[in-house]
A protein has these predicted regions:
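Conserved hydrophobic/aromatic packing and binding residues within compact polymer-binding modules
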Residues: 29, 43-44, 54-57, 83
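A short, Lys/Arg-rich alpha-helix, primarily the initiator
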Residues: 2-35
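Recognition helix of helix-turn-helix/homeodomain-like DNA-binding domains
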Residues: 48-64
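Short amphipathic recognition helices of helix-turn-helix/homeodomain-type DNA-binding modules
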Residues: 83-89
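DNA major-groove recognition helix of helix-turn-helix/homeodomain DNA-binding modules
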Residues: 65-82
């Protein structure tokens, strides 16, 4: 196996891991919105986007940019954190 194919395989593994984590975050945000009985319209208005776009985010048709994802979290009063595997940062 060449170095280029090792990098390609590694890159695919990273992308799959990130997609899984991303899906997990979106799923939790949707669950929180529903548990709190908040409408998509309310969340979209707070973020400053169209309701249709929030629906696309929730169905994972379109991925929100990091800024919008953070605004979504802020609206639900939850926060994303950054950490390392060893717990140090």
């Amino acid at each position: 196996m060449t170095v280029a194919s090792n990098i390609s395989t590694s890159s695919k593994a990273v992308k799959n891991t990130v997609r899984y984590q991303y899906k997990s975050i979106i799923t939790k945000l949707v669950q929180l919105r529903k548990q709190r009985k908040l409408s998509q319209e309310y969340i979209a208005l707070e973020i400053g986007i169209e309701t249709k776009l929030l629906g696309q985010w929730e169905r994972m048709i379109v991925e929100p940019r990091l800024f919008n994802l953070l605004c979504w979290c802020e609206t639900l009063q939850v926060y994303l954190t950054v950490s390392t595997d060893d717990g140090e940062f």
